[in-house]
Every structure is written in structure tokens, then in C-alpha cells.
Amino acid sequence: MIRDKNILAIIPARGGSKGLPGKNTLPMCGKPLIGWSIDKAKKSTYLDTILVTTDDQKIADIAQSFGAYVPFIRPAELATDQSSTYDVIRHALSYFKDTESKEFDFVVLLEPTSPLREDDDIDKMLELIVAREDEFDSIVSIGEVTEHPSIMKRLVGDGIEPFCPELAQ
């Protein structure tokens, strides 16, 4: 913990990918895609709990084999194309509060489809936000843009929207 902070990592991994079915369990350089995010989270010195939230038993089994905590299978209504990450996070936090009487000071969202983190990325981000928590309530990592504009997002006010709405479908 950083200064007695409880920190939760949430790795959301839906089973019903339309673009690449089963992508979270597909091998990438010798391990399932989801395994990369779990392994990086385990290298953090600050994360108290590494939770995988999924609607898919195969993903849950793989996540547990990598050492993640998977105490529930995500409800179907939170595993659709229209489900928001925000709602998935709220569900996970409600689970901990209601079932385990546990609350967290910070949540780290680790998308399994962004596996190329450096070993210390998570801890550096946590150190930064904890040191400046009176100024910021969230932090996000960014990198050089290599994606097509149709899948890019931009900040608008306190939300995110498609960079090119006319291309997003």
C-alpha cells in the first residue's frame, strides 16, 4: 500500500468479442492475452487486489491460474456491446463493499487489450496520483497514436467520445 491506501486493479475481460472472438484467451508470445495484464499487475508493489471481471468461465479459469482474484462471473447485462466500463467498475466496487465489506481508495483499470506495459508503469502512475491526489482524481496513460481515427477517442468535458464520430460504428 502507498501511505495506507487500498488499491484495486480491475481487469475487465468480456468473452463475447465480435471483432476477434476469444481474444482475451488467445496466445500472444506464449501466454493468453489476459495473462500479460495479470502478470504486470502482480509486479506492482502497491496493488492490494487484482480482480478480473468477466462473463466467461474460460477467461475466469485462465485468470485464476495466473493468480488473479475472480470471485464472481459478471452478469450478462454488464457484458454486452453497449455495457460501459464505468458500470463494470461500479459493479466490482459494489461487490467488494456489499460482499466483503471492503472499499478502495484508488482503482487501476488494466485493459487486457493493452498488454505492452513496462514493469514499473503501474507503480509510477500510482506514485504520481497519490502524491498529487489533492489536485487530481484520475490519471491515464497515453502513447503515440498508431490507430485508425475510427477507433480513437478524445476527451470532451469530463467524458470520452469518438474522435471521428462519422467514422465510429
Q: Whereabouts are the PLM-identified features?
A:
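Short, structured coil segments at secondary-structure junctions
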Residues: 46, 66-68, 156
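N-terminal glycine-rich phosphate-binding loop and ensuing alpha1 helix
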Residues: 3-53
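Conserved core of the sugar-phosphate nucleotidyltransferase
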Residues: 87, 91, 115-169
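Short helix-capping segments at alpha-helix termini
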Residues: 42-46, 99-100, 131-133
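Short phosphate-binding loop-to-helix
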Residues: 51, 58-108, 124-127
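A short acidic, helix-capping loop that chelates divalent metal ions and anchors anionic groups
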Residues: 17-21, 79, 112
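Short beta-strand/turn micro-motifs composed of small residues
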Residues: 13, 54-55, 111, 142
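Conserved acidic residues
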Residues: 7, 48, 69, 105, ...
